Amino acid sequence: MMFSRVMQLALICAVTCEDNPCLWERFTNSRDIEFMIPVVNLSTSRRLSMSQRICMVSMGKHWSRIFSEGEEDRGMKDLDPLLMSSLNWRGTAKTRSSNSFNFDILDGIFLGFLDLVKWGEEADRHTPIHPECIKSKVCGFMTASGPRIKTCTGKFRGADRHGHCTNRATPHEATNVISVGVQHAQEANQVDEHEARYISEARKSINPEICSIDGVEINQCDLASPGRWLMLHYASFRLQEGSLVYLSPGLNIKWSQINVPASDFYCINVSDHLNTHYRPCEVNCTDNCQGDELYCSVHQCARSAECKCSFIGSRGMAEVQIGDRWFKPAVVGSQQFFVKEDVPVLQQPSADCTTCSMTCTAEGIAISSIKDELKDVTVCVEGFCSTRVSKGSKVWKIEFHNQYPSSGSVALARGTTVSGETFELTAECGRRTGCEQINCLFCREMLSNPQCYPYGKWFLLFLILATLYIIVALLKTIMRIFMACLSVLYGPFIIIIKISRCLGRLGKRKGERTYVRLMEALDDERKPEVVRAPVSLGRTKQPRIVLFIVLALLVHMALCCDESRLVEETSVTCNPGPDNIFSCSTKEMITVKELRAGKTICVSLKGPGGSLSSPIKIKMLDIVGRSDLLDIYFTFNGHANCKSVRRCRWAGSCGNSGCLGVGKEDYDRELGDQESSLHPNWRDCYDGCGGAACGCFNAAPSCIFLKRYVTNADSRVFKVFKPSAWFLSTKIVVETTSHKEDVTLKSGEAKVIDKVSFHYRTDKNLFAGMSIPPIVTEVKREGKPLSFFLENQGQHPKCKDENSARTSSASNCIVDQNTISANVRVDDVSCRSNLVSISGMSTLKPLPQRVGDFLIQLHNDEPVLLATGDSGVVEGELQIDLSHKKISIKVDTTVCRGTVKELKGCVGCTKGAFASLEIHSTSAGSASLQCSLSSCYMEVQKGVNNVNCSLRFSKAVVEETCVLACSGSKEQLSIKGNLIIGGDFKKLTEDSATSFSHTDSKDTRIHLQTGLMNWLDTLFGASLLGKILGIGLAILSPFILILILRWILRVVLRRSRIRREPKYEMAKYS
């Protein structure tokens, strides 16, 4: 019964409300209006007109008083469940008790049309609208949506099969109202076709990421989101057919008061004070009404009249700014709309590239893709890594040139193809070691290692000496030719000089004779002629030229290898315990001066009888440059928003005192957008123009309300690192029998792990004076993030965490208010954004980036510096203090015997030498092999064990006796073999980078052999006498060889002459 009466009232409203400002049907009809299609999932609601859907008056605090007055004697008890104390409608009694949603939702929509005074009294002939709606001229409306999931608690207990709550259910606090908004309607002219096209294009540009609003397409999208409710401001414009609605997150509105219409005055009957809310004047007032000063200035007023009219403080006529133009809309307001946004086409979860492959041969590394082109590839081998962004290529080849990875080296390649497929490939670069690593002819590696070709070295030596002899002879011949040319040119040169001198003397004599004749003519005296003897010239001596030739064979510096440190029994103190387990300690400080990334150092103590403790393993994960970070914060691509409204004096929130009396809540009321307060925002009020020229009744300055706020433009988040001082640091993993921990040590820092102290010292001036701008990396869940330098540190937001940056939180983000500058004009405000584009800087200096001799990149979410070229070897050391550590050693009688099967590797290089041993042990335990410069810790099992032992030697030709020791035995082993000098991988590509490494210059001089000394040892042995004789023989050998050749030629020529002489004599006598 109630529903049918409400429906009748609603239908009457649609045709009889001529002065109702909420009726959009004065300008448009429901089939042409945009963005207001029904969002209620009820079939009955779809037949409602636009006015019936949106015209629920914005009463707020008035509802309770109106209903209480109406309940006394007007039969309103049945409407009590619809009572609402605020705009946040919590639902009705029907929602909580009934299994039907239809009636209460429609009641909520039609609530604004119920005329309480005329309830039941000829409703079809009276306007079913409350006077408060006419007084405010601002209508609020709701968009209902229901049912919403379930309204029952406790895992849906008390719900029927349709999902509705029954009487047994514990009621939820249902909230069926999705959106609440306000709107203002006014007289407006139609916009022409050109203006409509301009507004339509501006709507697309201001909402680039919105696909549709309430089902109306805004932009074409390949993939749209499921949708969400979003508060938008809108302005509706009249077209010749239908309407056009402009929407944006905010609107700049300018209100003016021109030609005050009668509807801007609220007239009531003053005779009956009890019914002021229900008895407005039946018709618009004329001269027979009384009113306020403004009303009487427009109309003639009577002092005694039952009707009194007052100015209701109307906003006036609204103009909205679209682009750089101002338009007068028919309706302006704000509402939550159901918006579907564009979803960027994300790459599908990376699939493995099944057509990608990698090979590692003697020539180099080749990475290829059969199906798609390579997008980016990172290749690492022997600690060197190179990155390449491919340009339309399916193959990337890296040549080794005159180098080859050592035995067991594995090349690793990671990257993606243009189709988004990822690959992670490995390839073993052969089992070559020692002399097999040399893959060039007449190169430095070959010349430095004569031990690798025992027979060819003599031939090579002869070629070298012969080449030197030829060079000397060639230089001597050139000098002879030069001197011969000088001797040929000497004669003509002397002749020319003599002729010039002769001519000079002749000229001088002639001049003297002329002078003498002149004097004789004057003095009549004749004197005898004087003849001078010529001056003889000496011959110039020819210069002597002395030639000095120096031969030097150089090899490059190399790194050390993995090593074991054994603390001898004399430095260890042990106390016996049960089961032959001794508790031992040492005061000795172990210093390791040769360090590299990937190196493992084993430290063991020798107990009674030579028994070894379980080693303390120190794994060097990296040695890179790190920085103390001044600041770490999150930022985003900020979008500057500026929203302004101009209000004439005495209208709305612009009171008598103008901007001085404006409060915080006034901005929200005037600008109509509370969601912007969730973002960093600033509120300002400026004095604007007043008077008739600006469309205002009062000449006092108007109020221009302005809100500036910053939002995240694209939901992307970036993390910013601001480095200060840089220093070398190492990350190590320490493993003992009972503990394992990783720690980062920076230069000069000491830390304790499981009672073992580690002190790291390096060259602190390596990065002195280095200045690096802030580093930015994009926070991404999938895919490769952008990393780059923040060169232009202009205005940008700074947030505490990722979520605050993604939502542009006002509480956790700091933004300088100068990021949005405001320029106040006569009746509006123009804004300019000073925000910098964070993502736009990614193309200027992307990481990795070369900085001097170093390469900076992000590694494990922190900026690090890597070495390039020859900058990677620096001095440094790691000190290990075991004085506070008790180490257990089990003493047993393990007996082991062994033989050396093979010795391969290099000397003075990163990986060092490897001795392959075959050890037979009587029981499981530990064994050690100790040589003159290094030692090796090994774990053995009962029986035969094939183990590899890492050692260091000082010579390429090794012939040394080492000691193989177990807890119950010691044995001498002879190690012989040829190693190569160097053998380290120099560089993968020109732009490759690697971790830093440390080496000791003193130790380097001990175990690094120059190529010349290696040649002497190889050719003539290690004794001094052998080297002296060998050097002398090498110097004299060319001359001796030439003498022998000459002697051979003479013998051959002599024999040929002897053979020819008998034939000549026989021919003579015949």
Curated annotation (Swiss-Prot):
Example of a GO cellular component annotation carried by this entry: host cell endoplasmic reticulum membrane
Region (Internal signal sequence for glycoprotein C): 541-560
Any one Gene Ontology BP term: fusion of virus membrane with host endosome membrane
Propeptide residue span(s): 550-560
Residue ranges that the UniProt entry lists as topological domain Cytoplasmic: 479-536, 1045-1070
Record region (Golgi retention signal): 480-522
Sugar attachment sites: 269
Keyword Disulfide bond: yes
Region described as Fusion loop: spans on this chain: 648-654, 690-701
UniProt site (Cleavage): 560-561
Residues carrying the site annotation Important for glycoprotein C and glycoprotein N subcellular location: 1068
Keyword Repeat: no
Disulfide-linked positions: 22-55, 152-165, 211-221, 267-309, 296-301, 353-356, 360-429, 380-385, 561-602, 574-584, 642-831, 648-696, 654-703, 659-685, 689-694, 799-813, 896-966, 906-909
Keywords assigned by UniProt, alphabetized: Disulfide bond, Fusion of virus membrane with host endosomal membrane, Fusion of virus membrane with host membrane, Glycoprotein, Host endoplasmic reticulum, Host Golgi apparatus, Host membrane, Host-virus interaction, Lipoprotein, Membrane, Palmitate, Signal, Transmembrane, Transmembrane helix, Viral attachment to host cell, Viral attachment to host entry receptor, Viral penetration into host cytoplasm, Virion, Virus entry into host cell
Segments traversing the membrane: 458-478, 1024-1044
Topology, Lumenal side: 18-457, 550-1023
Signal peptide: 1-17
Additional detail: The sequence shown is that of isolate Human/United States/1/2009. Terminal conserved complementary sequences assemble as a 'panhandle structure' in each genome segment.
Family recorded in the similarity comment: Belongs to the phlebovirus envelope glycoprotein family.
Descriptive protein name: Envelopment polyprotein
Organism in which the protein naturally occurs: Bhanja virus (BHAV)
The gene coding this protein: GP
